[in-house]
Amino acid sequence: VCFLIGGSQQWNGTQIPLYLSIITFLLTCFMIPALPNSFNEIRGNGELFPLNGPMWSLFFEYIGNILYALFIRRLNTKRLTIVVIFLFIAHSIFTIGNLSGYGTIGVGWTFDSVNFFGGMIRMLFPFSLGMLISRRFKAIKISYPFLLSSILLIVIFCVPYLAPIKDINFNGIYEEICITIIF
């Protein structure tokens, strides 16, 4: 609706016919992504889901659930640990090494090689790590857990983008610490 109200235009000003907006809407309802430069990539930005940008995350979560149902759940704890270590290394290299070129792990929203690969790693590492934690979890008593969690979230959300200094991607290091340890 917002795309139609906004004039049905791509970023470069190209007018999009109503029938393409309707087709794109229907494809989005069925979680069928748009490939870059395809007819249903109506906003001209290369997004997987042009009418609902954040839906890329749900798309990768569905892929994760399919992989879980077919393969990951069958791994014993030792093999899952090996998978998590491999994914941690891949995730760290991608994030700290700034393979996306964005200076952030903000990838996965399009089908280009960097974004799709990055989106898969971005989903698979925390997903597999969460499974490993759930298998090995031993509850401990913490005083004031809500207060401590709230303070921690406020502190980490107040950290701005950390610019690179002499080819060291400080923002990537910060994001890797947040994803791996804090979250």
What are these regions (language model features)?
Residues V1, L20-I181:
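Aromatic-enriched alpha-helical transmembrane segments of multi-pass intramembrane proteins
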Residues C2-I16:
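Helix-to-loop transition at the C-terminal end of transmembrane segments
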